[in-house]
Design a protein with these regions (language model features):
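Non-catalytic cap/lid and distal C-terminal segments of serine-dependent acyl enzymes
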Residues: 1-289
Length: 289
């Protein structure tokens, strides 16, 4: 556990399962409005990186120190956390994806798919109040950050639960899931932006090498079984083009109250990009204007 951190285990009434919160609190008195908060999806994987990054960046006067809340599961095994997250960070599986040749050969997650909306409701209704019980928080300075399916969930929240956060950091978001279903909500979101109803800042990033991945020579048991299937997966996911295209469309809608940045992290692939994405995301969300 990182310095100045505490662990909160609880059972969600909404999701009817157990969760673990990892909460890192700044080692300084809270300002009168409370500390900013970064809610980090996949806390089992990325909490330590985020806390260390926050500690370093907060040394500079132009970056606000913040509470880091890693949302995870009561396990110390990364493999378990990766399995448990699948239903939390997805919408119900559509036939268009289920029948895709490369995806059909993937082992199905034991808990299925489709609980993303419940997960985000749990975050608002169960996690935020628990955090507020242990530290003074600024309800007007809150960030949602996630990688991969966590990035997809972050985009879903941006489009559908915009008022829940002020900053959204989507790192290598899995826009491809369910034939890019998340983009079905883009048009209505843009309408609200144009009407002046949205106040949000979004950072969308991706690793430069995510669309040119090569089939690994070892440790590919959780990937498509052949090089051909793997290449079909890479082509289907379009990680870099999907991110850049969405970023460009949203950037064209920028106006007072709504800001978007898109970043390509040079030399990084999907598994390498979280540290760079988290560092850039903390800087984006917490840099003093």
């Amino acid at each position: 556990m990182a310095l100045n951190a505490q662990q909160i285990d609880f059972r969600s009434a909404i999701r009817q399962r157990d969760y673990r919160l990892m909460v890192s609190i700044p080692n300084k008195p809270a300002p009168k409005e409370g500390h900013p908060v970064v809610y980090l999806i996949d806390g089992n994987l990325h909490f330590g990186i985020a806390v260390d990054t926050m500690r370093i960046q907060a040394c500079w006067p132009d970056t606000r120190d913040a509470v880091i809340v890693g949302i995870g599961y009561p396990t110390d095994r990364v493999a378990d956390a990766l399995t448990l997250r699948m239903d939390d960070l997805t919408t119900p599986l559509q036939e268009s994806l289920a029948n895709t040749p490369w995806y059909r050969k993937m082992p199905p997650p034991p808990n299925g798919y489709g609980k993303m909306d419940d997960y985000l409701r749990m975050l608002d209704e169960e996690i935020k109040p628990r955090v507020a019980e242990v530290v003074s928080v600024d309800v007007g300075d809150q960030t949602l950050m996630g990688h991969s399916l966590g990035g997809l969930t972050t985009l879903h929240a941006l489009f559908r639960r915009t008022a829940s956060f002020q900053h959204f950091v989507a790192i290598a978001p899995s826009i491809w899931f369910n034939n890019r279903e998340v983009l079905d909500h883009e048009a209505s979101f843009v309408e609200r932006v144009r009407a002046g109803e949205v106040r949000a800042r979004a950072l969308i990033s991706v690793g430069e090498l995510e669309s040119t991945l090569r089939y690994p020579s070892v440790g590919a048991d959780k990937l498509p079984a052949s090089k051909d299937d793997f290449q079909q997966m890479v082509d289907y996911c379009r990680m870099v083009p999907n991110t850049q295209e969405l970023g460009s469309r949203l950037a064209a809608e920028q106006r007072p109250g709504f800001t978007v940045q898109t970043v390509v992290h040079m030399g990084d692939d999907h598994n390498m990009v979280p540290p760079a994405g988290i560092a850039r995301g903390i800087r984006f969300a917490l840099r003093s204007e």
